[in-house]
């Protein structure tokens, strides 16, 4: 079978799916119609099936051959035997022997028999017509399904019924059939399951069953999937007669869940009628839908579900799916309660949650996590995916059988936000796949006030999912049983095929965008219909009462019981005196903090290493730890250079990174480095993945060969996405504090396409959601004449969002001042000028007793700069990250003679030292490097200023004046010295673009800033 699958894969073009016998009904084969015998005279290479144009037919023939080799022509029998033996398709096929003269006579006789049977052609045409009819329903039946609960809109935005869908007998002529054929019995093809145990049905019954399967309250989009097995699986789930049956107990459970969903919203409306809560009215069926997905997934072995969703219905999901204590939810409506935790907090419909409980349907433990998110719709999608991937990684769930994700979407956002597309394209990448996500779209057919026809160009809001061959199940939300069935199928699909699936809940929004909004301004006719619409709970209760499943008193008792639960929780909420944001934590780290959520210490050990460890890592970094592995000649030279550096006890940038990573792996810290081209490195400096030059796709990661029991190292080239991938890595870093998760931009300039993740999650995440995160951003930065899009990581933006006060000098005598600063800041911003300091800051990120995002402006030209080297001595035990690197030359020996103290950061230091040496001013100008910009090293800089009492102060940067670090550094330096001296500026003039694209202009600007930095008279006119 494997060989045939391989063969079929080679032959299969991207055609519409046909059939696979694996799922076909057990029924007698249809009577074969007579075919004209072919005289085989074409060469093997000309056989059309070898070109891949008939791959579906080949697979059907193969399935028939498996059941009975004699049921296919001898040539097929030989072909399949050869293929199973391992022969390639071209040699496996052997043409049948040419026909003899006697055989040709037999052909002529057979032809005369055909001519004597004029009805044969009609029979064949009728059967082909029926097959086309069935296929038309499978492909386009969803277009005429009754999906809108209001009955006024077409879910696909098309009011015309497709001409090739049979919904009335007058359209039979399209297929060459007529009304007289309705009672004629037709054999059913293997591509349908409408027959159940029957192999033939009258045309009238075929149409009726197809209408029931595809044109009622469920619309199924799946025929674009180019996998026969998957298509056949879906057909079986929706076409089999009587398959959508529920027991009375299941119906009562569904009713009870609808009661909870509906009465929760009504309770909030009664108690807080003027509060925004973004209620679920109009799609109350979402709660039982989610619970059904979770129930079925739990039954299939899932024990951890990570969810992401927008504001619509969030409180209801927290209450009735995740089972957050109701009193904690009600407390969020009390404006008098103050928050006990540090930080700004967030509105109630953004908060996340983590809860472990027993699933009552399966009686198994299940953990539910709802990720906190901002109002930026769909921004949490990749975050959820990353967290899911991490949880799967840490529990060894390589197939996604234990941990899964559910993403909820609004219809307008699902179609309108590009991050949805980016996230979908991560779904099947080896280093990013979560083995299938269940997407649930709350399709209330409106986006705030915008009509769907103005919100998307595609027929459905879900069409983006087609790019990854995810089946899409549209369902009318006013048919709760149809919704439950679709959700069961979605969970089963994900469990079976480990691929994404979409459930489109076509519903409506009973109120405005929020409870204070008036929708009649913009959608008057729609809301007139909504005002007349019975709630789904009332409809379903009436149905069950009429069926005798429940009686009216039982239904009313269920309502009273839940109302009582809400009232009792409301009473308890009045006893609460304070709000605890940490009760809403979506990603707890058990054992990392104390029980009250505080760090276990406020100190950081030395980040240095013994020389033996440094040497061992360096030796592995400069070798190929796999036998018979041929690397590129240019890479051999790079590894040789690394080996020489190790012998000389020095490191460059790439080797320093290698040593930081390797040492953390030894300590059991998982490291994940992701981004565009990170395996080699944009600047061809890293080479963490070696490629065999003689064996295709054979690779080696030396970092995973360092120690016997080391943690795994994951380095992965990402898709060409910043927004999606950075969100994914942020989510991965949320799962555990004991991992170093890094995202590297190809150039720092490109991080701004991920600005939403930076602004809404990384920068304020802890303040809003009491959630620490240790993600590291590596942003290549430096003005090197490469133009405005390859020069600046926009440090001014990161620094502007730092939360320290530039006008307040902190208590510099405080114990562990530097660690306390790190604990209080919202993120750490550094620009290292030496490989050794880069090594230390990476290790410090893990050795700190808490986690903060780390922004590193990394170099480009310094990667190979001969002066950008560090000695092993700077990395040995007892050494630390240097927040400030002071002047250590002649100027430091005679500080009273220093006329100017230049402060700078990053690469420009090397330009300054070169110019200072050329001007012979090493005794007159001192240069101090600020390596850690935020939190600002007030204490160390005060010492530097005091050391040079006669020096004027200047900040020098290569960036333009309105960019870079100047506006951040100047007020803090002034505060440090109590505004005793001015802080002058030496750098480029203000500009709109980050850099010039002209090399000559670049060099002119550089020389001008160097002239300013070393002209001791330049600032006298401004005094």
Swiss-Prot record:
Temperature section of the record: Optimum temperature is 37 degrees Celsius. Activity decreases with increasing temperature.
This enzyme's EC code(s): 1.2.4.2
Binding site for thiamine diphosphate: 312, 411, 444, 446, 676
Binding site for Ca(2+): 143, 156, 158
Localization, UniProt: Mitochondrion; Nucleus
Regulation: Calcium ions and ADP stimulate, whereas ATP and NADH reduce catalytic activity.
Residues carrying N6-succinyllysine: 74, 564
SMART domains: Transket_pyr
Cross-link type Glycyl lysine isopeptide (Lys-Gly) (interchain with G-Cter in ubiquitin), residue numbers: 534
Main location: mitochondrion
A cellular component annotation (GO) from this entry: mitochondrial matrix
Entry annotated with the keyword RNA-binding: no
N6-acetyllysine sites (modified residues): 401, 970
Domain of life: Eukaryota
One Pfam assignment: OxoGdeHyase_C
InterPro entries with a match to the protein in the record: 2-oxogl_dehyd_N, 2oxoglutarate_DH_E1, DH_E1, KGD_C_sf, ODO-1/KGD_C, THDP-binding, Transketolase-like_Pyr-bd
Binding site for Mg(2+): 411, 444, 446
UniProt KW keywords: Acetylation, Calcium, Glycolysis, Isopeptide bond, Magnesium, Metal-binding, Mitochondrion, Nucleus, Oxidoreductase, Phosphoprotein, Thiamine pyrophosphate, Transit peptide, Ubl conjugation
Cofactors required: thiamine diphosphate; Mg(2+)
GO molecular function: heat shock protein binding; metal ion binding; oxoglutarate dehydrogenase (NAD+) activity; oxoglutarate dehydrogenase (succinyl-transferring) activity; protein-folding chaperone binding; thiamine pyrophosphate binding
Chain positions found as Phosphoserine: 100
Function per UniProt: 2-oxoglutarate dehydrogenase (E1o) component of the 2-oxoglutarate dehydrogenase complex (OGDHC). Participates in the first step, rate limiting for the overall conversion of 2-oxoglutarate to succinyl-CoA and CO(2) catalyzed by the whole OGDHC. Catalyzes the irreversible decarboxylation of 2-oxoglutarate (alpha-ketoglutarate) via the thiamine diphosphate (ThDP) cofactor and subsequent transfer of the decarboxylated acyl intermediate on an oxidized dihydrolipoyl group that is covalently amidated to the E2 enzyme (dihydrolipoyllysine-residue succinyltransferase or DLST).
Entries under NCBIfam families matching the protein: 2oxo_dh_E1 (TIGR00239), PRK09404.1 (NF006914), PRK12270.1 (NF008907)
Subunit structure as annotated in this protein's UniProt entry: Homodimer. The 2-oxoglutarate dehydrogenase complex is composed of OGDH (2-oxoglutarate dehydrogenase; E1), DLST (dihydrolipoamide succinyltransferase; E2), DLD (dihydrolipoamide dehydrogenase; E3), and the assembly factor KGD4. It contains multiple copies of the three enzymatic components (E1, E2 and E3). In the nucleus, the 2-oxoglutarate dehydrogenase complex associates with KAT2A. Interacts with ABHD11; this interaction maintains the functional lipoylation of the 2-oxoglutarate dehydrogenase complex.
This protein's name: 2-oxoglutarate dehydrogenase complex component E1
Species assigned in the record: Homo sapiens
């Amino acid at each position: 079978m494997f060989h045939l699958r391989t063969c079929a894969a080679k032959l299969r073009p991207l055609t519409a799916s046909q059939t696979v016998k694996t799922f076909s009904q057990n029924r007698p084969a249809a009577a074969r119609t007579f075919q004209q015998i072919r005289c085989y005279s074409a060469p093997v290479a000309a056989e059309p099936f070898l070109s891949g144009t008939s791959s579906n037919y080949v697979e059907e023939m193969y399935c028939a051959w498996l059941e009975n080799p004699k049921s296919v022509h001898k040539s097929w029998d030989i072909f399949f035997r050869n293929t199973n033996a391992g022969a390639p398709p071209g040699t496996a096929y052997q043409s049948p022997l040419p026909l003899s003269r006697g055989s040709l006579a037999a052909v002529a006789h057979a032809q005369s028999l055909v001519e004597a049977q004029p009805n044969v052609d009609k029979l064949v045409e009728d059967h082909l017509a029926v097959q086309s009819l069935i296929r038309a329903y499978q492909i386009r039946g969803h277009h005429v399904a009754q999906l809108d609960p209001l009955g006024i809109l077409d879910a696909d935005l098309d009011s015309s019924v497709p001409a090739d869908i049979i919904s009335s007998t007058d359209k039979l002529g399209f297929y060459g059939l007529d009304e007289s054929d309705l009672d004629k019995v037709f054999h059913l093809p293997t591509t349908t399951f409408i027959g159940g145990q029957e192999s033939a049905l009258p045309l009238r019954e075929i149409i009726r069953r197809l209408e029931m399967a595809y044109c009622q309250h469920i619309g199924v989009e799946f025929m674009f999937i180019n996998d026969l097995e998957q298509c056949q699986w879906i057909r079986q789930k929706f076409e089999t007669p009587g398959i959508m049956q529920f027991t009375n107990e299941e119906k009562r459970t569904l009713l009870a869940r609808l009661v909870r969903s509906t009465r929760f919203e009504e309770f909030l409306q009664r108690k807080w009628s003027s509060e925004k809560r973004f209620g679920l009215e109009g799609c109350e069926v979402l709660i039982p839908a989610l619970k059904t997905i979770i129930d079925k997934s739990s039954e299939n072995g899932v024990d951890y579900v990570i969810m992401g969703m927008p504001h619509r219905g969030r409180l209801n999901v927290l209450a009735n799916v995740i089972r957050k204590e109701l009193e904690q939810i009600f407390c969020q409506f009390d404006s008098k309660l103050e928050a006990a935790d540090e930080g700004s907090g967030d509105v109630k419909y953004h908060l996340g949650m983590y809860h472990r409980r027993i699933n009552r349907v399966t009686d198994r433990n299940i953990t539910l996590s709802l990720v906190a998110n901002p109002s930026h719709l769909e921004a949490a999608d990749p975050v959820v995916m990353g967290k899911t991937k991490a949880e799967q990684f840490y529990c060894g769930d390589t197939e996604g059988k234990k941990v899964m994700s559910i993403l909820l979407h609004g219809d307008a956002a699902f179609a309108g936000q590009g991050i949805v597309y980016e996230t979908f394209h991560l779904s099947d990448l080896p280093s990013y796949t979560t083995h299938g996500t269940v997407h649930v779209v709350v399709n209330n057919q409106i986006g705030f006030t915008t009509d769907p026809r103005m919100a998307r160009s595609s027929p459905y809001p879900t069409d983006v999912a087609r790019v990854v061959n995810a089946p899409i199940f549209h369902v009318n939300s006013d048919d709760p049983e149809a919704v439950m069935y679709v959700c069961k199928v979605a969970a089963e699909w994900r469990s079976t095929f480990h691929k994404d699936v979409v459930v489109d809940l076509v519903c409506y929004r009973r109120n405005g965008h929020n409870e204070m909004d008036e929708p009649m301004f913009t959608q008057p006719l729609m809301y007139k219909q909504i005002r007349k619409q019975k709630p789904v709970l009332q409809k379903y209760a009436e149905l069950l009462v009429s069926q005798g499943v429940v009686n009216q008193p039982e239904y009313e008792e269920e309502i009273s019981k839940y109302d009582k639960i809400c009232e009792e929780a409301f009473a308890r909420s009045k006893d609460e005196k304070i709000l605890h944001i940490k009760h809403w934590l979506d990603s707890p780290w058990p054992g990392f903090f104390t029980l009250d959520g505080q760090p276990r210490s406020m100190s950081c050990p030395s980040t240095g290493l013994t020389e033996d460890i440094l040497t061992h890592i360096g030796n592995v970094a400069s070798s190929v730890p796999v036998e018979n592995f041929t690397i590129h000649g240019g890479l051999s030279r790079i590894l040789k250079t690394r080996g020489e550096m190790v012998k000389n006890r020095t490191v460059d940038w790439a080797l320093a990174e290698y040593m930081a990573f390797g040492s953390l792996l030894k300590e059991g810290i998982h490291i994940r480095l992701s981004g565009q081209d990170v395996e080699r490195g944009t600047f061809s400096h890293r080479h963490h993945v070696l490629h065999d030059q003689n064996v295709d796709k054979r690779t080696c990661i030396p970092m995973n060969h360092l120690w016997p029991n080391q943690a795994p190292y994951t380095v992965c080239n990402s898709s060409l996405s910043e927004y999606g991938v950075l969100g994914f890595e942020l989510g991965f870093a949320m799962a555990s504090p004991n991992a170093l998760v890094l995202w590297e931009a190809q150039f720092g300039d490109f991080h701004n396409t991920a600005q939403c993740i930076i602004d809404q999650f990384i920068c304020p995440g802890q303040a809003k959601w009491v959630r620490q995160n240790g993600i590291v951003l590596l942003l290549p930065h430096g003005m090197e004449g490469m133009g405005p899009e390859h020069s600046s990581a926009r440090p001014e933006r990161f620094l502007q969002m730092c939360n320290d006060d530039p006008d307040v000098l902190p208590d510099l005598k405080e114990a562990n001042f530097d660690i306390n600063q790190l604990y209080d800041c919202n993120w750490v911003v550094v620009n290292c000028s030496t490989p050794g300091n880069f090594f230390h800051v990476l290790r410090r990120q893990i050795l700190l007793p808490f986690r903060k995002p780390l922004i590193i402006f990394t170099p480009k030209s310094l990667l190979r700069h001969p002066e950008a080297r560090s000695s092993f001595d700077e990395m040995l035990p007892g050494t630390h990250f240097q927040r400030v690197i002071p002047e250590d030359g002649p100027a430091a020996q005679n500080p009273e003679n220093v006329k100017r103290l230049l402060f700078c950061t990053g690469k420009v230091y090397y330009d300054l030292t070169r110019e200072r040496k050329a001007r012979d001013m090493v005794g007159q100008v001192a240069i101090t490097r600020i390596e850690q910009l935020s939190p600002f090293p007030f204490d160390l800089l005060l010492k530097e200023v005091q050391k040079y009492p006669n020096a004027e102060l200047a900040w020098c940067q290569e960036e333009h004046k309105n960019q870079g670090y100047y506006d951040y550094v100047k007020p803090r330096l002034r505060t440090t010295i109590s505004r005793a001296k001015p802080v002058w500026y030496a750098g480029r003039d203000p500009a709109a673009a980050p850099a010039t694209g002209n090399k000559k202009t670049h060099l002119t600007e550089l020389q001008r800033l160097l002239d300013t930095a070393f002209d001791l008279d330049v600032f006298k006119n401004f005094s």
